[in-house]
Amino acid sequence: LLTEPQTPPQLATERYSPKLAKADVQALAQCARQHRTTLATLLSVGWALCLRRLTGNDDVVFALVVSGRDSRIPGIDRAVGSYAGIVPRRVSIDPAASLARLIADAEAASIRQADYETSALNDAIRSLPGNELPFDTLLSITNFPRSNPIGPIQLQDVRVDNHNALPLNIIADIGEEIAFHAYFDQSRLPPETTRGVVDMFADVLRTIAGEADQQVQALAGPALPVLTPLPNPEHPHHAIHRHALRSPDQIALRFGEVVVRYGDLDRRARMLAAELSG
């Protein structure tokens, strides 16, 4: 599914609106009430099940966007500005367990993780071996109230583009229906594959709404190893360092009359890395 990354990435956006109709969302909300959880938790479980099918792994990790608006802070719902952050969400899936058990475990994990929603992602990554991101997909769940306008100001035809270094970002916009937006690097993920992944996500959510008492392996189907890791991908800084050793005087960057050669670029990068990690 994923191919070797290119430089620069070929960013693209696909919009799916809606994929879950009003009746499906109502069934999903009823499931959330029955299991004393939230729609956001059910969507997280659904995305974890998708990743299981795509990777063939029962232990998956993805990036989850959190609001950063702790309900324990008075007046936080009226505060202006973005407090959003990203946390790694790890889901361990027991194929023999019921989906209800998986939902309960996910809700408990969400509660435990609430105290870390304002933590810096970089701090968490620095504690990992090799400072590597433990995920390559991101899920963002938006649930803004639409029935209570504030003041006379109205916004129309608003478009927001979101891009980052991850090859696939899914935004689920919850209203009476659930619309899906996919932001992806099409040099690594073809558009038709992205659509297939989003369709799978919607189908899994419909299944969750109607069959929460069955076993996970019966709901998600057999693991489908479609997503495969890249064969020993080389990081850009390694390539720059290797090139600097071979041709230190070759021009790496040029801006107007300013010229930076590979040897100097490598030296500056190492100094900056030492400063940031120090």
Where are these regions (language model features)?
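His-Asp-centered acyl/peptidyl-transfer active-site segments
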Residues: 14, 31-44, 53-157, 186-190
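AMP-binding/adenylate-forming domain of the ANL superfamily
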Residues: 11-30, 100, 104, 159-179, ...
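Histidine-centered acyl-transfer/condensation active-site motif
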Residues: 39, 172-191
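Short amphipathic C-terminal alpha-helix that caps PH/PH-like domains
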Residues: 103-110, 195-208
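Short amphipathic alpha-helical face segments that pack within enzyme cores
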Residues: 38-50, 196, 200, 271
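Active-site catalytic microenvironments for nucleophilic, acid-base chemistry
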Residues: 49-54, 90, 204-207, 275
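Non-catalytic, low-complexity flexible loops and terminal extensions
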Residues: 1-13, 65, 90, 109, ...
